A protein has these predicted regions:
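A nucleotide- and high-energy phosphate-metabolite-utilizing enzyme signature
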Residues: 1-463
Length: 463
């Protein structure tokens, strides 16, 4: 096609499908000119990105101009400025279909940029997790604003008794709350509002009804899959009473729920709660109700018993569904690291406010300083977490699928090796196995005491 494209940098098993992709990409209008305009380093990186990620390869077929996005906005600061522009455009879209299109185009291009930096090795794991979380935050803010634009002409603004506007509060939970979102993840959200009242438009409705309409429309803008794809799958099950509860609840109802019905597992969940919208309105409830619910004033060693119960439930599910190769739920997986950190947060967080933090990576170094773990254990857990999150993202980058299980097809194991930046799957597998052994040993020590924990294998510690 008159433009050099180097296949030799990718494993042999991936060269034939990559060559077919290159032929097809070259047929797309503008692709070769955009490719030729790339700096040398991006041209050198593209073969591994397209070989490791069918998602990235498909984006470049569908949207060749995404190459220019990567070229112009590749570095994090440049990307933040460009993302802010997309957020403004999507938020001000007067027609829902336009908002949907802009959000999906934005997501497609920014996810390509994030995958490209990750696979090429230019982004550390922490950068990738933060970039994914910032993209989700921006899409949520834009979708909320766009949904509001559709409602305002009919209903006006939701107001309290004094006529002041009442905001929607959106909490990010789970990995989104900790700003550590994985590549193809659901986003766990909770919708709240601060005060009852009525809207001030031509058709007056109660604030609760307004926010339920707004919440449904927000979810639809993000979650619906159409010819442009989707933005984020939205999971609302962490709200009070789960699927049986209202979509949007008042702060007063949340306060009552936590006091009367809050369960131990919900304390773990609410560690992660972070206000994406409506932070000022949420802050008093967090200080007076959520924080005391999560973090007790006394040393709370009872959380270990509840942790054992939760782990037993997960272990039964892993066995039933044959999830031994599950990076999240399997033995020594990501969930066990989260449990270790969160258990220590719940035990000591009431007396040590530094531990009141939704980020695993930010809390881990504090554990050694709080004498909750040795410096070597913290270093081991941190390394294991980064290995497992790199592998998890690598699996999901293959096809933008929400999976946490290691592939079984040889070609996908090679793709995962590319995405992890290792020479071959033997190296990648050994690295994952070593990380899981380290995690399992420490998790056993937390649950049952060091004497009952599995012995650490010498070779496991070498990874």
């Amino acid at each position: 096609m008159g433009v050099d494209f180097e296949l030799g940098s990718v494993p042999e098993l991936l060269r034939e499908p990559l060559a077919r992709w290159w032929e097809r990409a070259g047929e797309q209008e503008g692709f070769l000119d955009l490719y030729a305009a790339l700096p040398e380093n991006l041209r050198a990186e593209l073969p591994r990105v397209a070989a490791g990620s069918e998602f990235a390869a498909s984006v470049l077929i569908r949207d060749p101009w995404a190459l220019e996005w990567v070229n112009r906005h590749g570095e994090p600061e440049a990307a933040r400025a460009a993302n802010a522009d997309y957020e403004t455009r999507a938020a001000s879209a007067a027609v829902a279909a336009d908002a949907q299109r802009l959000l999906r185009e934005w997501r497609r291009r920014e996810m390509l940029r994030i995958a490209w930096r990750d696979i090429s090795g230019r982004a550390a794991v922490a950068e990738t997790l933060l970039a994914l979380s910032e993209l989700a935050d921006g899409c949520i803010r834009a979708a909320s604003a766009a949904a509001g634009l559709q409602l305002h002409p009919v209903f006006g603004k939701p107001c309290n008794a004094g006529g002041d506007e009442v905001p929607l509060i959106v909490l990010g939970m789970g990995k989104l709350g900790g700003r550590e979102l994985n590549f193809s993840s659901d986003i766990d959200l909770v919708f709240l509002f601060s005060e009852k009242g009525q809207t001030d438009g031509p058709r007056e409705i109660e604030n609760e009804e307004y926010f339920n309409r707004l919440g449904r429309d927000l979810i639809r803008l993000l979650d619906v899959r159409n010819e442009d794809g989707f933005v984020f799958r939205v999971d609302m099950r962490l709200r009070p009473f789960g699927d049986s509860g209202p979509l949007v609840v008042s702060l007063a109802s949340l306060e009552d729920y936590l006091q009367e019905h809050g369960r131990d597992w919900e304390r773990y969940a609410w560690i992660k709660a972070r206000a994406i919208l409506g932070a000022d309105a949420y802050a008093p409830t967090y200080q007076e109700f959520v924080r005391p619910f999560v973090y007790r004033r006394y040393l709370d060693f009872g959380v270990i018993d509840s942790l054992r119960d939760m782990k037993a439930l997960i272990a039964r599910e892993v066995s039933r569904r044959e999830l031994d190769q599950h990076l999240k739920l399997g033995r020594g997986g990501i969930r066990e690291i989260e449990f270790i950190v969160q258990a220590m947060q719940l035990v000591r967080g009431g007396s040590d406010k530094r531990l009141q933090n939704a980020s695993i990576l930010e809390v881990l170094p504090l554990l050694a300083g709080s004498k909750l773990a040795t410096a070597s254990d913290v270093a081991e857990l941190t390394d294991a977490y980064l290995v497992l999150r790199k592998a998890e993202n690598g699996v999901q980058m293959i096809r933008d699928e929400q999976t946490h299980s290691l592939p079984t097809e040889p070609v996908d194991l090679v793709r995962l090796s590319v995405n992890m930046g290792v020479a071959d799957w033997a190296v990648g597998s050994a690295r994952i196995d070593a990380a899981r052994e380290q995690v399992a040993r420490q998790f056993g020590a937390v649950l049952f005491g060091a004497a009952d924990a599995p012995h650490r294998h010498d070779e496991a510690g070498a990874g």
